[in-house]
Amino acid sequence: MELLKQRILQDGKCYPGGILKVDSFINHQMDSKLMYHVAEEFARLFADSGVNKIVTIEASGIAPAIMVGYIMNLPVVFVKKKQPKTMDNMLTTTVHSFTKSRDYTVCISHDFLTDDDRILFIDDFLAYGNAAQGIIDLAEQASAKIVGMGFIIEKAFQNGREALQERGIRVESLAIIRSLDNCCITIADENED
């Protein structure tokens, strides 16, 4: 997605340790027009997947997930990082955050993730695939089917895609970062695998 790639190169910031900061347009302050185009592309990519529910994890996945849900006319549910006192019938798993260097016990109400669901997971980043693996675990607990996973940005050098594809998950990323070596952002061309 050329518009996204240009924005990453223009406004993305690189930090040592493989960190790409896009908080000025994706995951703190959001460019709503860019987010709409992102959602349109995910809706196009997964139009024939049979998805009936969008799932994300708080917090940065919520905005794109809501937009995808709106365009596809589907409900959106987000996995919570803190258990509400009011949540019953809960499914839980542990997810490690790469950027925050900590584990979270995340949860979702089984009322909102069931064996009738064919879910599309939407998130801002795919790095090592930790959040995505957590979603797979929750889906398995609920006997829900994952029809695909869509990521705004993938850091290919952290190999999250391979781990997901080994489990038979369809992965679509709108911008694939090949390298952040020497804090230089290298984005894959459309024709690269």
From Swiss-Prot:
SUPFAM superfamilies per the UniProt record, alphabetical: PRTase-like
Binding of xanthine, residues: 20, 27, 155
Gene3D superfamilies, per database record: 3.40.50.2020
HAMAP family named among the record's database cross-references: XPRTase
Residues annotated for 5-phospho-alpha-D-ribose 1-diphosphate binding in this entry: 127-131
Listed transmembrane segments: none
Entries under InterPro entries matching the protein: PRibTrfase_dom (IPR000836), PRTase-like (IPR029057), Pur/Pyrimidine_PRTase (IPR050118), Xanthine_PRibTrfase (IPR010079)
GO BP annotations, alphabetical order: purine ribonucleoside salvage; xanthine metabolic process; XMP salvage
GO cellular component, one term: cytoplasm
Subunit composition and interactions: Homodimer.
Similarity remark: Belongs to the purine/pyrimidine phosphoribosyltransferase family. Xpt subfamily.
Domain of life: Bacteria
Subcellular location(s) of the protein: Cytoplasm
Keyword terms, alphabetized: Cytoplasm, Glycosyltransferase, Purine salvage, Transferase
Chief location: cytoplasm
E.C. number(s) listed in UniProt: 2.4.2.22
GO molecular function list: xanthine phosphoribosyltransferase activity
Protein task: Converts the preformed base xanthine, a product of nucleic acid breakdown, to xanthosine 5'-monophosphate (XMP), so it can be reused for RNA or DNA synthesis.
Keyword Cytoplasm tagged: yes
Full protein name: Xanthine phosphoribosyltransferase
Pathway: Purine metabolism; XMP biosynthesis via salvage pathway; XMP from xanthine: step 1/1
Catalysed reactions listed for this entry: XMP + diphosphate = xanthine + 5-phospho-alpha-D-ribose 1-diphosphate
